[in-house]
Amino acid sequence: RVSIPSVSKEHNRANAIFSRMGYVNFTDDETIWDDNDDDETIWDNSTESTKPSDEFFRVVGGEDAKPGQFPWQVLLNGETEAFCGGSIVNEKWIVTAAHCILPGIKIEVVAGKHNIEKKEDTEQRRNVTQIILHHSYNASFNKYSHDIALLELDKPLSLNSYVTPICIANREYTNIFLKFGAGYVSGWGKLFSQGRTASILQYLRVPLVDRATCLRSTKFTIYNNMFCAGFHEGGRDSCQGDSGGPHVTEVEGTNFLTGIISWGEECAMKGKYGIYTKVSRYVNW
């Protein structure tokens, strides 16, 4: 269950938005996953079941975020280094990409982070006690299909202006919000393909790409649980190390989770796009 923290004005605004749209509450279903979402349908005329190679972890051309600008963003640390991003669902749970989770890995979640090269008063560190991969996720079949996972923290986060859950709408409205056309992605991933990672949290506004254009851009399979976003001319994109981080859509001043950074071919290449997990498929959570 996703609680509505009293400290978060964003969630109150979200309920007001839904009221105007004829929908009063959001994300109050007790189930972890939507059992009706096993659709492996391939977009349009794509027929290959080719898998991207392991190097495609999937913010190039982005801007430095201000402290607290993306308070739902978290950093995932392994035993030796940071490796992925994620989003705060509530005080005890984080959502990220399933492909970030390697067998036996010990994960530390860092919330309230801005500059990863400095110890900051705003940061909160928690260990992960439980990992839940989507029940249809099968890395041996396709590492990026149903690319979504939940992480349970060992103790609750203390919510404040630097550590705040992202709003999650119901399936219908999450899909509608995605189609608004552009969303924000953020992370500490590589600043250019094969380059160095960012010290300060980066963000970028990326346009949604229609299915036909996306299919023409790649030889790899694009399922209905994925969507494409980015720029045809290249130069701006999510990149290695950003995986698991949020794609959010702003609606009347409130930010909603609409995607999860998943994969791509290199980073910011002309004619190539970032591929994201479509959150609307998984919100009965």
UniProtKB/Swiss-Prot annotation:
Signal peptide: none annotated. Ca(2+) binds at residues 115, 120, 123. Its main location: secreted. The record marks 13-14, 58-59 as: Cleavage. Activated by factor XIa, which excises the activation peptide. The propeptide can also be removed by snake venom protease. Activated by coagulation factor VIIa-tissue factor (F7-F3) complex in calcium-dependent manner. The active site is at 99 (charge relay system), 147 (charge relay system), 243 (charge relay system). It is found in: Secreted. The keyword Repeat does not apply. The keyword Transmembrane helix does not apply. Keywords: Blood coagulation, Calcium, Disulfide bond, Glycoprotein, Hemostasis, Hydrolase, Metal-binding, Phosphoprotein, Protease, Secreted, Serine protease, Sulfation. The modification Phosphothreonine is found at residue 27. Heterodimer of a light chain and a heavy chain; disulfide-linked. Interacts (inactive and activated) with F11 (activated) in calcium-dependent manner. Interacts with SERPINC1. This is Coagulation factor IX. It comes from Cavia porcellus.
